[in-house]
Amino acid sequence: MFKFAAAVILCLVAASSTLAQHNPHWWGNRNTIVHLFEWKWSDIAAECESFLGPRGFAGVQVSPVNENIISAGRPWWERYQPISYKLVTRSGNEQEFADMVRRCNDVGVRIYVDVLLNHMSGDFDGIAVGTAGSEAEPSKKSYPGVPYSALDFHPTCEITDWNDRFQVQQCELVGLKDLDQSSEWVRSKLIEFLDHLIELGVAGFRVDAAKHMAADDLSYIYSSISDLNIEHGFPHNARPFIFQEVIDHGHETVSREEYNQLGAVTEFRFSEEIGNAFRGNNALKWLQSWGTGWGFLPSGQALTFVDNHDNQRDMGAVLNYKSPKQYKMATAFHLAYPYGISRVMSSFAFDDHDTAPPQDEQERIISPEFDEEGACVNGWICEHRWRQIYAMVGFKNAVRDTELSNWWDNGDNQISFCRGNKGFLAVNNNLYDLSRELQTCLPAGVYCDVISGSLIDGSCTGKSVTVDGNGYGYIHIGSDDFDGVLALHVDARI
């Protein structure tokens, strides 16, 4: 009887722990993460203080923090080829990373690290040198900077059948040396790495290539890492937020459902379907049942995004910054509709899949520069600084914990809906104007459309909408308007 009771208690503790790993530990009503892809730590610290904190962003996903192989031309993907767990990359060193985490936490912006637990680097002729000066022999699976030897890896094999679980989880993803997460030594080094980041004050982790690791092995690792550091403002016994990269199009042998109890999961179907809709391949009217009605994961288990650093580089339905009008409409819908744990992308310009981040002649990443309106100008795209996007982060904060109501559509590509009595969104993706009275659900008053302008010193620099005592307002979105979306909320009342 005692053994049974003890087993039940252990199961309850494990279940409680995994549920806690779905909590992003946001400040107040903040609820949007931004991925500052390839930014330097010092620049992220400054961005937290000058822009992200004041604009109400909840957190930052940062690029991998540990030492990586140096590849010719310095493509972005070299960051995903580790050779040690030393915290030295082109983004900065450990001291700069720790300073960034502290400064961002101080202004209510949490840090989530993109971590590489699945693999080390790919093949390299001879001795490879890393960003911290460590040497490795990838062809021999020798990484003295950890240290790892060939005994710590799965046998070399290629993934040729994505419906073969063994290949997916024990062969080499695009030639990257595949770690054996069932090994006690490998587990100990991964846990040590994650614990060090927790000690420095991070709030959680984006787990790269999670589907290529057995869920049982990840469960062991997650349950073995430390609670968050209370010296950085986290409560006692708080568990790291975990969101896992699991690409599952609905017909995968290794499915997202194997991982969603361990932490949140990247909902790639969201990205694909929202791109289809706003590219005009699917009528917006069907978005009324968006979320679980489309076969997506439960809201609290889904990390949602319009694009990410990988799929924005692929041809297909996924939207990116190169289709700005549709991208801004999709992002507005993403942040207005009550589904998922939202992340927005902040990119650098690219012409091909391998383009390096903006860098100088010595191949050092350069800092973003801004024009007089705050937009980036020197190779950084900085979608998070587009007014239409950061304004919707504010919208999402203003309407947090409200329900969707009063859905309207024209049977095609014009839609609107309310978020409680705090927010209203309208979208026009037709080739003709949207001009009509619509229920906004807002209290009577005059509201600034935060898409076309900003509320500054009591005046709106863009469109304004007068809402009557019954909640109705006249909404106009021309087919040739710069933006095909209009957004009102209670914090933008004139």
Swiss-Prot record:
Ranges annotated as spanning the membrane: none
Active site: D208 (nucleophile), E245 (proton donor)
Entry binding sites for Ca(2+): N118, Q169, D178, H212
Catalyzed reactions: Endohydrolysis of (1->4)-alpha-D-glucosidic linkages in polysaccharides containing three or more (1->4)-alpha-linked D-glucose units
Cofactors, names only: Ca(2+); chloride
Top class in the EC scheme: hydrolase
Entry keywords, A to Z: Calcium, Carbohydrate metabolism, Chloride, Disulfide bond, Glycosidase, Hydrolase, Metal-binding, Pyrrolidone carboxylic acid, Secreted, Signal
BP GO terms, sorted: carbohydrate metabolic process
Pyrrolidone carboxylic acid: residues bearing it: Q21
EC number: 3.2.1.1
One term under GO cellular component: extracellular region
Disulfide bridge map: C48-C104, C157-C171, C376-C382, C418-C441, C448-C460
Pfam families the UniProt entry points to: Alpha-amylase, Alpha-amylase_C
Binding site residues for chloride: R206, N308, R343
Signal peptide: 1-20
Cofactor note: Binds 1 Ca(2+) ion per subunit.
Site (Transition state stabilizer): D310
One term of GO molecular function: metal ion binding
Main subcellular localisation: secreted
Protein's cellular compartments: Secreted
Assembly and interaction partners: Monomer.
Family to which this protein belongs: Belongs to the glycosyl hydrolase 13 family.
Entry protein name: Alpha-amylase-related protein
